Each structure stands twice: as structure tokens, then as C-alpha cells.
Design a protein with these regions (language model features):
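Bacterial N-terminal signal peptides
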Residues: 1-6
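Sec-dependent signal peptide cleavage junction
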Residues: 7-14
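Beta-strand-enriched, solvent-exposed domains that form extended recognition/catalytic surfaces
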Residues: 14-131, 455-644, 654, 660
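Pan-zinc metallopeptidase signature
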Residues: 14-19, 28, 331, 336-430
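Compositionally biased low-complexity segments at domain edges in trafficked proteins
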Residues: 128-159, 528-565, 656-698
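Catalytic cores of extracellular degradative/oxidative enzymes
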Residues: 141, 149-340, 344-361, 371
Length: 727
């Protein structure tokens, strides 16, 4: 990583100059995971500044190098910058103002060779370049002597193109004693971010890439700053953002490149999850002082931020989807902190490993499910209740795995302690965590010493099961049974310690019924929970998810079927699915009854804002579903045999075995058998669930129900194959 100050010679006029352009290995294992990480940022300067209205001619001369190069003229305003592809034939480029020529670093093994000439009688100014451990005096002497419009600062992880108007800012850095210290500051950011993302060399997919970020100014940039495909920039003519130590924008924009393919999958994280990197950086570096100088609590306005979040979540019943991006960040920070930073890193590493498999399907790995599985299994705590409390959709099978493993459930402090006891609870809990909030996650054991307890009344709502004879319900904290009672229409558990508990029903009849809720919350008050016991007539294995993606392949929404509940859920979680489809229909969902009457219709336009939607719609066997997607070829996703990518409009018939595509004519019963075998084989191998009583296991009930829906011959076959699960 060490270099010296580079004193580039002036480029003479009408001289053909040769230069080798080195290549770097393409880190496909990173890009395959949906992480851009400065993918097209790395570039090589030519050592000079091209004068305004001056022609630069270039060609590539290595016959063994087959790809074209990208030549760019860069400055501090993209509207004035130029670019052109360079092949074996001479090409020309010029600009209306002095700009710096760069060649984008190609990916591959072989180097390229360029020849270029500047068509002018004037000499070009040399580009001052400072590398780590260089000579600052010589660097500024050259910058002053040349009166260069730009200079370049290079580190091992990044390059920073600095305009002349910032020369004195660099000469007299306010937050750093030297340019080396500035480079070390940025290197520290990249080093931590690489560690968070799991680039530790522990496996081939955990190697870091060799490409560098490119940092600059852009007076025509969007917003205050932005991360883009070719660079990341301060949206002003100055690079002052990159020269400050306490620059949240620096952390925020760099971290955008570390967002992976799981981001935004079934929950909005676009301007949120990158900030998890910035939060960890600030709290690791500054400790609790980050409450006052960091972005998480709005630069010292913690009480105001916390009060607003409490009002939304605890008083108004809002979910993750309803609160603003800072509040979403607090919630994600609390999840991450409780699971441990290593659990967050494990999400990255496991996802990269999966994403580099040939049969990988990104839509199958939603962020809520990844968090629930990896956070729970890595920390040996059950995150299911806490995630569902925030309105996130979870795979029921993973939630059961957590419970069977005996993991204690975690909950936000504000969800298990009343407002008038929060101060005392915080005094107990806060010293144990670096980042504190009313919504920090705790186990029941952590608050037990408060001595708080309340009564819990559980009401079984009128449903499919009305005779409760022989049924028992247990209130459990992890593997520990706190209390149990015979099931009645209304039951009260007295003097239960504050906390979150899971319910476990048993009894012969429960082989065929499913509770609508699995978790209950207790505060030091009178607590009430309502749930239904629902007959499992149609297995969850028959359900399908149809996913709508939008601009930049972002998850925009989904239609999920729940055939046992006779409903479909339409979820929309992108305000504008695709802004380029201005005033154009982008997605349309229609549900029709068997006689052709429209039950539901929703039109979604590309650039018209939509509020977060989570609509539960009536869906009966025999109904039809129609989805129009303007980019169905690659942005309507689901099982391969359920999506006709050659048609923008897809039609399905709802059957008891699942969806039948009316164009592709898949066999829903055969599709269901594949799912039966996948679940059945996994349960046979599951040490915790395999010996578990059928009546206590949701997964076994779903498997049994699916098997019973088949033909007598197939039912007999699968009951014999998975007999060990039901004996």
C-alpha cells in the first residue's frame, strides 16, 4: 500500500506516447452477491490535465487484449465530463474545460497497451499525485507551480480527485495533521467495512477485491452526495466532505457499495442498511459519545428521537414499514447489536456463498428470514417474535426451529416493560450495551431482577375448534415451561414475570390445528392476547410467493397466497417502483372469482408514489390471478414453472395443491410432491423436530396435511416414506 509522491513530466504536444494499462482480477464472487463495492470505480490516470478545447487521440495496440477500454475526462461536474470507448482504431475526445484523463481499469488477466497523443502546440499541465508516505512539500510545490486545476490523492482502497478550489483545504487540513493521516482515516473506514462484510480470507468467496473506490466532487450531482456506478461524489464543486473526520456522508456513501443482494428483499433498506456500517464505525471509534456526534440519534437529539419512536411503535402500533429511515435504522441496529456484530457478518458470508451457486435464486432469500435464521442460530436466541412484532414476514418453519432448539425469545425493552418502569429498566440494562434505546433487545432473564410481573389472559376466538377437551397450552421461555393450563375459551395466567413467551399447544386434536399466534407479551399489568385454533385443511406447502421487482432490480412488492386462510396478501414496499416508466402502468394485480367477477384490482404506475401496502384479500379455490408486469421477462419472479417470461401478463388458476399457470400448464400436484420431499427429508434429518410429538410441531402438521391432499396411492407412498415423523 506504500507509495511516493509522483512528479509527472509535462506532456508535450504532437507526441505519440505509449502506456501500459494493467488489469485486475474481477471479484465475481462479490458482484454475484449483489454488492457493487466500487465495481467500476478503479481507474488509471495518464499523468496530465487536458486543456480545454484540446483534442486527445488514443487507441489500444495489444492484439491479445480483446476488450475495449473506457477513456474518461473527469473533473468536478459531470455535466461537463466526457467519455469514449477505445479500441484498436484511433478515437478522439475533447472537453470545454480542463479535465483529467483516466482509463477505467479493466478486469481480466492481460494488460492493455495504449498509444495517445495530444493534438496541440501547447504543453499540458502535469497532474500532481500524492501517494501514501509521499512528500507533501514536493506535492504542493508542483501543484502551485503548475497551477493545476486538479490533484489526485491515492490510497490502497481509494483515489480522491481534488479540484484546485480545495487546494488550501488540503494544505491546511482541519481534522488531520497530514495527508497521510487523511489517507489512514479513509483506510480505517474501508478496513472496518471490509471486516463487517466478512472479507477475512476464510473462504474463496471471502477474499477482498483489488479495485479501488473513486471519490470526487460533482456540482451536478443528486442530493447532498451520492454513490454511483462509476464513482461516489459530494454533490457540490468541492470535495470538502471527503476531507472531514466527522462526515456522516462519507460513511453513508461508501457503505452504499457494501449493500448486497439481500438488501431490500421484502423490507425497505435502501437508505438504511448502509447506515449500519456507519453506526458501527462511529460507536466503535467514539463510544457512547456517538450519541451526541453521530447520525443515529440526530446529533445529540436522542430524547426527541426516542420519544417519537415510542409514540409510533408503542402508542400508535406502527411497524417497521411505517417509521422513517432513522427510526428504521434504530430498529435494525438493535437487532444487530443483540445478535452480535459477528452475526451480521455471517449474513454477508453465507449469502455470498449461496449467491455463487449455480442454482441460486435471490427472491428465495428475504432479509427478514436471513436475519431470523442467522441471528437466531448464531446467537442462540429466538428473534422470531421481535421481527414479527415489527411487521416483518417470516418463514414459519425457521421460527419453529428456533423454538425447538430452546432458544429464549428476545423482545424490545419497551414491549415488555411499561412506560413508567422504563427508566429503572434502562438503568439495569443500558450498562450492558454500547448503543442504548427503549427498543434495545433483551431476554426475559435480563430483566428478571426488576421483579416485575403481570397477569396474562388468553382468549381463544371462535374458529374451527370449539371442543378443547384434552388440550393443554404451555407458556415457555426458551425450553423452560413457565406455566401450563388446560385449554379453555378464556384462560388467565397469574403473576407471570415480564417478558416474551411462546405458546405450545398439545393434545390429540392439535395434530390437525394450528394456532394463529405463537408468542405473547407480558408487562406488569393486565395483559390480553387473542388467537384462533385453525384447522389445517390446505398445507402451507401449497402457497406461493410472486415477487415484483422494479428499478435497479429492487424488490417492489409481492403477492403471497395463504390458501388455508382463503386469502392472498398484496405487499408494496417501494414508493416508486420504476421512475423511468413515467405515467405508465408498471404492475397490475387482478383477482377474479370462478364466475369471472373481479374480486380485487390494483394498478401500480412506475413513477407514482405508493404508500406501504399490506392488503389481505379474499382468495378461493377456483379463483384466477392475473399479474401484468411491464418487465416480466426479468422482474417478475417466482418458481420457474410459474412465470412465463415471454409474456408481460401471467394468469394462474388457484387449486388446492397450489397455483396452476394457464399458459405453462404446470402440474400443481407434482409441484407439491417436490415440496413434500424437500420438507420431509429435512425433518427426518432435524434432530430436534424428528422426535417431537406430531401435535406440537407445525412443520409436521403442514407435511401431513400436504400428503393427505394427494391421490390415495401417493398419500400411502409418502406416509410410508415419512412414517417415522408421525408414529
Amino acid at each position: 500500500m506504500f507509495g511516493i509522491f509522483v512528479l509527472s513530466a509535462n506532456v508535450g504536444a504532437q507526441e505519440v506516447t505509449s502506456k501500459e494499462i494493467f488489469s485486475i482480477p474481477e471479484p465475481t464472487w462479490i458482484f454475484n452477491s449483489g454488492m457493487s463495492k466500487g465495481k467500476n470505480h478503479d481507474r488509471q490516470d495518464l499523468g496530465f490535465i487536458l486543456n480545454e478545447n484540446t483534442e486527445l487521440r488514443m487507441r489500444q495496440t495489444n492484439a491479445h487484449f480483446k476488450n475495449k477500454l473506457k477513456l474518461r475526462l473527469l473533473g468536478n461536474d459531470k455535466k461537463n465530463e466526457k467519455s469514449i470507448e477505445v479500441g484498436s482504431n484511433w478515437v478522439s475526445i475533447r472537453a470545454d474545460e480542463p479535465l483529467v484523463p483516466f482509463i477505467d481499469t479493466p478486469y481480466g488477466e492481460g494488460s492493455a497497451q495504449i498509444e495517445y497523443e495530444v493534438v496541440t502546440s501547447k504543453e499540458m499541465k502535469a497532474l500532481p499525485v500524492y501517494k501514501y508516505h509521499g512528500n507533501e512539500t514536493m506535492f504542493f510545490s508542483m501543484w502551485d507551480t503548475e497551477d493545476a486545476e486538479y490533484a489526485l490523492i491515492q490510497g490502497v482502497d481509494f483515489q480522491l480527485l481534488v479540484p484546485k478550489l480545495d487546494k488550501e483545504l488540503v494544505r491546511n487540513l482541519k481534522d488531520f495533521p497530514s495527508i497521510d493521516a487523511l489517507i489512514e482515516y479513509h483506510h480505517g473506514i474501508f478496513a472496518l467495512f471490509n471486516g463487517i462484510a466478512g472479507f477475512d480470507g476464510s473462504a474463496p468467496e471471502n477474499q477482498n477485491g483489488a479495485n479501488r473506490y473513486f471519490l470526487k466532487a460533482d456540482d451536478s450531482g443528486a442530493g447532498a452526495a451520492y454513490y454511483g456506478g462509476d464513482w461516489t461524489a459530494n454533490s457540490e464543486p468541492t470535495t470538502d466532505m471527503w476531507l472531514k473526520e466527522l462526515s456522516w456522508a462519507t460513511l453513508h456513501e461508501i457503505a452504499h457499495g457494501y449493500q448486497a443482494g439481500f438488501d431490500g428483499q421484502d423490507m425497505y433498506t435502501g437508505e438504511v442498511s448502509n447506515n449500519l456500517f456507519g453506526v458501527q464505525y462511529q460507536y466503535e471509534k467514539y463510544g457512547k459519545k456517538a450519541d451526541d456526534i453521530g447520525w443515529l440519534f440526530n446529533l445529540g437529539k436522542k430524547e426527541e428521537v426516542e420519544n417519537k419512536l415510542y409514540d409510533k411503535l408503542s402508542r400508535d402500533g406502527d411497524t417497521y414499514h411505517d417509521v422513517d429511515v432513522r427510526e428504521q435504522l434504530i430498529l435494525l441496529t438493535m437487532f444487530k447489536q443483540k445478535a452480535g456484530n459477528d452475526s451480521f457478518t455471517k449474513i454477508y458470508q453465507e449469502y455470498r456463498k449461496m449467491a455463487n451457486q449455480s442454482d441460486f435464486k435471490d427472491w428465495e432469500y428475504t432479509l427478514p428470514n436471513l436475519m431470523n435464521r442467522i441471528y437466531s442460530e448464531n446467537s442462540k436466541q429466538d428473534f422470531s417474535a421481535a421481527l414479527k412484532k415489527r411487521g416483518l414476514y417470516l418463514d414459519e418453519f425457521q421460527a419453529e426451529k428456533n423454538r425447538v432448539a430452546g432458544y429464549p425469545a428476545v423482545a424490545s425493552l419497551a414491549d415488555i416493560v411499561s412506560e413508567n418502569e422504563l427508566v429503572r429498566a434502562r438503568q439495569l440494562i443500558d450498562p450492558n450495551y454500547l448503543i442504548n434505546s427503549n427498543f434495545e433487545l433483551v431476554t426475559n432473564e435480563e430483566i428478571a431482577s426488576l421483579g416485575l410481573a403481570g397477569d396474562l389472559t388468553i382468549e381463544i376466538l371462535p374458529s374451527d375448534l370449539s371442543n378443547f377437551e384434552g388440550l393443554t397450552v404451555e407458556l415457555k421461555d426458551g425450553a423452560t415451561i413457565i406455566a401450563s393450563q388446560p385449554v379453555q375459551q378464556k384462560m388467565t395466567f397469574k403473576n407471570i414475570p415480564n417478558g416474551v413467551y411462546h405458546l405450545e399447544f398439545s393434545g390429540e386434536q392439535m395434530k390437525y390445528y394450528l394456532p394463529s399466534e405463537n408468542y405473547v407479551y407480558v408487562k406488569e399489568t393486565q395483559n390480553h392476547a387473542s388467537l384462533s385454533l385453525i384447522k389445517a385443511d390446505i398445507s402451507k406447502l401449497a402457497d406461493e410467493d410472486l415477487i415484483f421487482y422494479g428499478f435497479n432490480d429492487q424488490w417492489s412488492g409481492s403477492l403471497r397466497t395463504n390458501l388455508n386462510s382463503r386469502e392472498a396478501t398484496l405487499t408494496l414496499n417501494m414508493p416508486k417502483p420504476h421512475y423511468l416508466f413515467k405515467d405508465e402502468l408498471y404492475v397490475k394485480v387482478t383477482i377474479k372469482s370462478q364466475d369471472g367477477k373481479i374480486r380485487y384490482e390494483k394498478s401500480i404506475y412506475g413513477d407514482i408514489p405508493e404508500r406501504f401496502t399490506d392488503d389481505h384479500l379474499l382468495l378461493e379455490i377456483g379463483d384466477s390471478i392475473e399479474i401484468y408486469h411491464a418487465e416480466a421477462r426479468n422482474r417478475l419472479k417466482g418458481p420457474e414453472n410459474l412465470i412465463d417470461r415471454g409474456q408481460n401478463t401471467n394468469h394462474w388458476l388457484v387449486t388446492e395443491h397450489g397455483l396452476k399457470h394457464l399458459g405453462l400448464n404446470n402440474n400443481p400436484e407434482k409441484d407439491l410432491m417436490i415440496k413434500i420431499e424437500k420438507l420431509g427429508n429435512s425433518l427426518v434429518k432435524a434432530e430436534g423436530i424428528k422426535p417431537m410429538a406430531w401435535e406440537r410441531s407445525m412443520a409436521k402438521k403442514q407435511l401431513w396435511t400436504a400428503i393427505q391432499s394427494l391421490s390415495p396411492k401417493d398419500t400411502e407412498h409418502y406416509m410410508s416414506q415419512y412414517y417415522v415423523l408421525f408414529k
